[in-house]
Amino acid sequence: MKLVVTEKQRMGQLIASALGQYRVKTLGGQGKRSRIISYEVLDYVIVPLSGHIMNYVTPKELERWTHSSVDAILNDPKSLVKVFQRKGYSQPLRNLALNASEVIIATDSDDEGENIGLEVLETLRGIQKPVKRLWLNTTVPSDIRESFSRLRQFNYNLAFSVEARRKIDAVVGFSATRELSLSLKYKVGKSVLSFGRVQTTTLLLVVDREREITNFIPKPFWEITAKVKKTNFIHQSSPFFDRTKACEIFEKVRKSKQFLCTNVREETTLVQPPKPMNTQEMLRVGSSFLHISPSKVLGLAEELYLSSIITYPRVDNQTYSHSFNHKSNLQKLLSGNNFKDYASKLLQNNLTIPTRGKLSEDHEPITPIASITEYQKNTLAFRLYELILRHYLSIFGPPAKFVDTTVDGLIQVEPFRADGRKLVDRGFYAVYYYPPKEKVMIDVFQPNTTYLVEGVDILEKKTAPPPRYSNSSLLAEMERAGIGTKSTRPTMIETLRDRQYVRTNKNVIYPTEKGMKLIEHIEKPWGNYISPKFTSRVEEEMEKVARGEKNWEELVSSERRAFAEAVATFRKNRS
């Protein structure tokens, strides 16, 4: 018998169904939420978990929130203990493993899934059995069966990198949350002041942007425009920040009726199709078009994946392997969707080579693998599917072709210019979700020809502050700054909202007074520890653990020491 452990019940059922006729057995627990079951099929026993089964907690003697408990968490390695969240799994897993010839970890195929697999192996400590890893890219039954024929080795380094993150976040979160709640309860409020390494750094981004907007002082500037035929020209020195200079030039040209065209340039510009879709792009596009949080986008994608409609949705990769059969996949998309004609044209013209982006050998990019016209009456899930489908079809499309036109001319020797862009071939934009960016159409002009000036104007404008973050722009900034991972970023905005540090209105993110005050009190003593650079550095260290270049426990110890110094600095400043 082979023991297979999955991360979720639905995945356990999908694997069992792919392998053959199965029967369900109760291993323990009562009621829908606490019942532990197995699926028996062929010579496999499949046990589904419910996510992480173990967690870090403080021992009973440190449950009381005091400053001394903070010191213990930061200085005593035994102050955090790993315990079962669901105690009922331990004995059934051990009993089954004793009689198994092999243990197959079939948790989600990403770093978090590898870490949950590590929890399974810790549960089976002392039971020596061969361990293999099932790595799935889709939940299509034939793909599941094929994956069982090419099981991998379990990636301990990847699992340890997540273990390091979880333990560092527990040390920092437990100690800082207690320290802040005890020290600032009369300044910020008596509610718990939650602190997290990624969470608080993300809050800092939102607060810094709000301050930038609040402190922004608009500066006036002037633009001089002229209308010739039906085309709007602008003075080439615009914008003017010197009012006197702007008015001087305006007075010089405002009554002139002659525009001398000096140059006309036309050039063809090709805009290439997008790179294949990874998680970050899916979250950005999904939250922008569907007006929902990134975590909800990921939840919808998970549903589509478990329904064998798309490939695995947690992926960094933007380059397909050479073995991926796009012709076969496009054939599946020829019916039952609104873009079958476009897919048919791709096949007819043999356009089946996708664009390439960054390479990360975790999974294929996110790909539609089934053609549907609705999804269980879930409109949002279907709309996300259509975005993924549009993106996939667009990566094969021909480039879009534009003609860019620039017209230069003189009014009273003052240089004016007009720019235009005309779309001449839609290319991949025929199916892509973003429309092509065209500039204003301009009239036909001939060099060394004089035209009538229909009017000259001077416009006073003001500089504007940067916009507040939206869900998608904050996600993009987090990725740019190296804050969090593809697994942790989507939930972070919702966590900040749940803890009343930010609020969202029409997809625009605002810090609350509580969030502003928290940053105000900790940025001076903890500036180094809440900066994006610090969080990014920790993520880089965890990547070293994943590559086998660093010991995870040494990383935890060094970050523990660093944060103990941060707390000491905070207390010194407070006193």
List the model feature ranges, each with a label.
Residues 2-3, 22, 123, 153-154, ...:
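Basic, low-complexity terminal or inter-domain segments flanking catalytic cores
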Residues 9-12, 16, 43-46, 50, ...:
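Amphipathic alpha-helical transducer elements in NTP-driven molecular machines
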Residues 30-62, 200-245, 393-441, 547, ...:
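Structured, non-catalytic alpha/beta "coupling" segments that mediate domain-domain communication
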Residues 85, 90-91, 98-99, 139-228, ...:
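C-terminal or mid-to-C-terminal helical accessory/interaction module adjacent to the motor/catalytic core
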